[in-house]
Amino acid sequence: MPNASRVVIVAGEESGDHHAAELVKQLKAVYPDLEISGIGGKHLRAAGVHLISDLTRYAVTGLTEIIPFLKIFRKAFQDIKQHLSTQKPDLLILVDYPAFNLRLAKYAKKKLGLKIIYYISPQIWAWKGKRIHLIKDCIDKMAVIFPFEKTIYENAGVPVSFVGHPLVKKIAAAKDKHSSRTSLGLPLNEPIIALLPGSRHSEIERHIPILVNTAKLLTLDSPKLRFVVPIAGTINPDKVKAYFSNQNLTVTFIQGQAIECMSAADFVIVASGTASLECALLEKPMCIIYKSSFLTYVAAMYFIKVKFLGLCNLLANKMMVPEFLQYDCNAIELSRYISNFHNNPNQPESMINQLAKLKESLSSSQADCSLFDLVVAELPEKNA
């Protein structure tokens, strides 16, 4: 049993911060003397982690969006390198965030010889597949959340365990539609569409105008239609609300609680990312949107090698849920699809049945072990 071991954990985005915090809570409950520090956000801080930096506030993606924050990221990288060199932890846990974490893994292994677990694999199956060579050289154990990733790493000779997807357990605890509406103060018998534009500033700027116009078109045919918009903690609520002002729409804004908002809805329009998988695991009728800068889009067309953007479609290897991307991401296309979807009684049932099968494939009952057990197995035995 580990005693007074030192662990450093690095999670640079809000979703990773949340997942990492759940692990820390489990570890602290069993090993209260465990010293845990690193990079994270409000969830890791609340779990008792001593934070060196918080990068979750700078939620950016794409080639052009990251430029204004490069100085901040460079400083955080230097700070965590210094921290690792000083602390020499028994275990380094890297959570997602590959552009930052793979560079850190190379330094931590080559310069310091640290033991490293990487939780939530880089999407090497989508782009930059050659990163698997760096992973093989630097990572002691991959903890993957998709079953097919295990096969990829096994074939490359990388130690790997499938630990189940963290969202499955989270979704299992979610309220049903009726309870969610009651909790959020939403009417029980009126049609509701949830609008999830994303958690990054660039996503808000590109997606919200499209969602507002989509909502206006939909209400022309369905005047009683209501909308609920959960606002991510990384976004200024006033900025989101300003887009909807004076638009003659019935909109409820909720701080956070994205899962509850999706559960309360009859249909969800969601930006590609973690929320789209949450929606799929809720077995909720949905469509996926995404619009990036032109430069990012061109780069993606050149480098990304998968057929789909939505995680549920990637996992199913088919277009289970429609994707409206870049130039197809517009109010006319979206409103037309949603209207046709609800006028065809077989479509919602078919989508829900397919999503239920996907959910089962990701459950922890199919996992090799839990992330907690994997981490504990890698911690050293120490004398009291």
UniProtKB/Swiss-Prot annotation:
It is an enzyme of class 2 (transferase). It catalyses: a lipid X + a UDP-2-N,3-O-bis[(3R)-3-hydroxyacyl]-alpha-D-glucosamine = a lipid A disaccharide + UDP + H(+). GO terms for molecular function: lipid-A-disaccharide synthase activity; phospholipid binding. One of its GO terms (biological process) is lipid A biosynthetic process. The keyword Oxidoreductase does not apply. Pfam families: LpxB (PF02684). It comes from the Bacteria. Its EC number is 2.4.1.182. Pathway: Bacterial outer membrane biogenesis; LPS lipid A biosynthesis. Keywords: Glycosyltransferase, Lipid A biosynthesis, Lipid biosynthesis, Lipid metabolism, Transferase. GO terms for cellular component: membrane. PANTHER family: LIPID-A-DISACCHARIDE SYNTHASE, LIPID-A-DISACCHARIDE SYNTHASE, MITOCHONDRIAL-RELATED. Condensation of UDP-2,3-diacylglucosamine and 2,3-diacylglucosamine-1-phosphate to form lipid A disaccharide, a precursor of lipid A, a phosphorylated glycolipid that anchors the lipopolysaccharide to the outer membrane of the cell. Belongs to the LpxB family. This is Lipid-A-disaccharide synthase 1. The gene is lpxB1.
